[in-house]
Amino acid sequence: MTDRDKAEIFIDEPRRRTPVAGRYDVIVCGGGPAGTAAAVRAAENGASVLLLERQGSLGGTWTGSLMTWLMDVENKSGLLDRLTDGICSLGSLYCRQHGDYSFCPEDMKCVMEQMAVEAGVSLLYHTMLAGVITEVPQGGGVPAVKGVITESKSRRQAFLAPVIVDATGDGDAAAMAGCSFFMGEEGTGRMQPMSMIALVCGLSVRDVRPFCLNYESCPGEAQRHFQELFASCGIRLSYSMPVLTHLKGDLFSVSLNHEYQVPCDDARQITDAVIRARAEVLGALHKLAAADKRWESAIIAHTADAIGVREGRRIRGNYTVTREDLISGRTFEDGICDVTFNVDIHVSGKTGSGSWDDGGVCVKPYQIPLRALIAADVRGLVLAGRLISGDFYAHASYRTGGNILKIGEAAGVLAAAAARTGVAPDEVPFDVVREVLGSGIGT
């Protein structure tokens, strides 16, 4: 490659007029667990809501990335109860250790979609966020959101709303709007690995029961047995504690892959990680089928449409949840989610020992305040999901499914209240949010 090839080359695009395709009270960017919860709650509280999703279904990490188990679900009533009831009615909800749940991703897609439609949410699939429209007040000050720009089969369009919820997972909307953010561990920059999960069918539950998290008698037992099985067949994995979960009938999910130090904002590196990950997953399972009779009838039904991302941008909010908050078990007057999950930091490199560590943090039950869901740098922008304002260690605790759903609910209630009353999210009285979310939050 020549120096000229290495130099940045730009193209000046012609100025263009983008048609406004709709006006709403609230626009939610991202239809994962947090985004769906935010959209449903906002719509149920009187807001007109547009939910934008780049894939063809709701659920995000739970469905597109096949993360088929829910953790930290205690004290998370509300939408979680409605979701689990719906999935249970379809016959795919299994209780795991410590009260966690596993589920069939197709059932989750159906239940979440029906929930959104019944709430009156306007869904727009196969739509990419291309920009966030902001406006600086006359005389200067903090910019305010006015809408978003999208790209899809309908070409380039604009949608307007006074309140936007960023539920993209990686904080794409906030970054486009000019918000400051953090990535990785403070001081080192290390980031948690990505993972490719697969669905496997054709197995006998009786034959693989010792390897299933659903049926283990003590934490970690099934993963150790599963790792020993691969090792006995001469198969070395990038993830030293592989996971097998029974979902429904003869359907299982398998997680055995780690992709290290892949930034969430680099499409080339993510693509390379996906190619490596899929090759490892397919190769390992084919070798296992050839080496162990219990696995010879296994059929790899599906690999995830999107590689699972544990960590991306963490957007600066009006409060940042910290390691110290976890250690002290801090509660807040505006607490919206009770978190009990440990710090779960998957090793950041192949040379690491074990599969995860707690960073030396002993977590006491703590709360996430509503202020951590309000972007500090842009007016009208609400944060939902793992991208809320927190440090590396706090994020490694609250990023699990039960918490993400509850954070999404609070974001939706806040967004609807702000849009209805014509004020900024940080001007909405917390009692308004508390009243809708119900008991069990706050101090």
Label the model's feature ranges:
Residues 2-7, 15, 23, 41, ...:
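Conserved N-terminal/central alpha/beta ligand/cofactor-binding core
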Residues 35:
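N-terminal Rossmann-fold NAD(P) dinucleotide-binding loop
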Residues 2-8, 16-17, 61, 140-142, ...:
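Flavin (FAD/FMN)-binding glycine-rich loop and adjacent Rossmann-like elements that form
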Residues 27-29, 38, 43:
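Membrane-embedded transmembrane-helix bundle of lipid-linked glycan/lipid transferases
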Residues 20-32:
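Beta1/beta-strand and adjacent pyrophosphate-binding region of the FAD-binding site
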